[in-house]
Regions:
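Histidine-rich, glycine-flanked metal-binding segment
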Residues: 1-50
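Divalent metal-coordination and catalytic microenvironments
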Residues: 9, 24, 45, 56, ...
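Metal-associated gating/positioning segment near the N- to mid-region
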Residues: 46-111
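Active-site mouth loops of central-metabolism enzymes
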Residues: 55-68, 89-91, 96, 117-130, ...
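A glycine-rich helix N-cap at a beta->alpha junction
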Residues: 106-122
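Histidine/acidic residue-rich metal-binding segments in metalloenzymes
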Residues: 131-300
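His/Asp/Glu-enriched, well-ordered alpha-helical/loop segment
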Residues: 197-225, 272, 293, 298-300, ...
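C-terminal cap of metal-dependent C-N hydrolases
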Residues: 315-318, 371-426
Length: 428
């Protein structure tokens, strides 16, 4: 078995240490380590984190391979420091059966760049009318534990209650895309001053907040787990904070773009800023950062949503919603959370590795950097500064809102069970 010696890495941002990998496992962590025949990686004070875990990606395969494939998506994930991603169910066909989730799971196994855990649809065809084969997907080779109709809201309260009751039997979780559909008909951006000035249909905060309020109460009533996807408003933060104070089993995520970007960018009418949920106000952005720091929001998830050029190179109203995010996520978190003093690197690891793996019941990821643990690791050059150029992305799509923007930090190495998937910032 191959050995790799990472020399002088700041484990979780602490004092420099050496980490010896033997095969798929961390063999030793300490100072002055040596190993005969080992490949040496000189970390030179770079930050060593457990491999990142993304609870919310859209890999588009099967059905929209023009946007992304499991292979290109996992290459993008590895480039961004991720060793595991959860793939949303809004594919063609929809991942609402054991057969489709097993297909996605097997494609992930074949890619070899990171682990892929499929998310099963809550309802058949994402239509919100009939529960999918939740038990069959859980019992399949893919072992699905997270279920979501993401892209659409499970807006029927009875269906949502039944889903929560069903997944409770095997410790699963329903991940809700909180968007009351009637309140967002014709909506194009956040409802507020900017939407009024631009004459674009407004997307009110209450459309998100009302669903979250309903679903945390349903979860309390059923005694089940609910996860709220991509929180985007200060009001949503307050509802989740209240629910947690009552002991309700709710977790929540925020995307990197909602930690940095605001609806003021929509004044450009550039569809790259069109996303669901929409970019909100500066007040919302600051509330989301504080909530991520204090634990009200549990994790960062990218909501990586690739689209081909033609789906974004059009007028605003006709453009698809979504942004790619796997290759820039850690940099945005460094800028918004670490460099502002809201989180240290141990806190980043907790929110981008440990907790996502825990919420998704994913074994072998989000583990301590210690002897005997799986060697899923990410090495980050936090001193690096660079301008985002989507031409260099591993993703098949280029719809990033950060093109031309300087961001800090760069993943130099990613290790999946002891095998380097990224070396010196390039895919291995």
């Amino acid at each position: 078995m191959s050995k790799i010696l990472i020399r002088g890495a700041k484990v979780l941002g602490g004092e420099p240490q050496d980490v010896l990998i033997d095969g798929e496992t961390i063999a030793e962590v300490g100072n002055g380590l040596s190993a005969e025949g080992a490949t040496v990686v000189e970390a030179d004070g770079k930050i060593l984190l457990p491999g990142l875990v993304d609870l919310h990606t859209h890999l588009r395969e099967p059905g929209r391979e023009d946007s992304e494939t499991v292979l290109t998506g996992t290459r993008a994930a590895a480039s961004g420091g991720f060793t595991a991603v959860f793939a949303m169910a809004n594919t063609f066909p929809v991942a609402d059966t054991a057969g489709v989730v097993e297909q996605v799971w097997r494609l992930g196994k074949e890619s070899g760049y990171c682990d892929v855990q499929p998310i099963g649809a809550v309802t058949v065809g994402l239509e919100g009318k009939q529960l999918s084969e939740l038990g069959a997907m859980h019992d399949s080779a893919a072992g699905v534990t997270v279920f979501s109709d993401d892209g659409k809201c499970v807006d029927d309260a009875v269906i949502m209650r039944r889903a929560l009751e069903y997944v409770k039997a095997f410790g699963g979780v329903v991940a809700q895309h909180a968007q009351e559909p009637r309140l967002t008909e014709g909506a194009q951006m956040n409802e507020g001053i900017v939407s009024a000035e631009l004459g674009l249909g407004g997307w009110p905060s209450v459309a998100e907040e009302s669903i979250i309020a309903r679903d945390v109460l349903l979860a309390e009533h059923v005694g089940s787990r609910v996860h709220i996807c991509h929180l985007s408003t200060a009001g949503s933060v307050e509802i989740v904070r209240w629910a947690k104070s009552r002991g309700i089993d709710v977790t929540a995520e925020v995307t990197p773009h909602h930690l940095l970007l605001t609806d003021e960018l929509v004044r450009s009418y550039n569809p790259v800023y069109k996303v669901n949920p929409p970019l909100r106000t500066e007040r919302d952005v600051l509330a989301l950062r504080e909530a991520l720091a204090d634990g009200t929001i549990d994790i960062v998830a990218t909501d990586h949503a690739p689209h081909p050029h033609e789906d974004k190179d059009c007028e605003w109203a006709a453009a698809a919603m979504g942004m790619v995010g796997l290759e820039t996520a850690l940099s945005v978190v460094q800028q918004t959370m670490v460099e502002t003093g809201l989180l240290d690197w141990a806190g980043v690891a907790e929110r981008m590795s440990v907790k996502p793996a825990r919420i998704g019941s994913l074994e072998g990821h989000g583990r301590p950097i210690a002897a005997g643990e799986p060697a899923n690791l990410t090495l980050v050059d936090s001193a690096y500064r660079g301008v985002v150029d989507p031409a260099g992305f591993a993703s098949r799509s280029r719809n990033t809102p950060y093109e031309g923007r300087e961001l800090p930090g760069r993943v130099t190495h990613t290790f999946l069970r002891g095998r380097a998937t990224v070396v010196d910032g390039k895919l291995a």
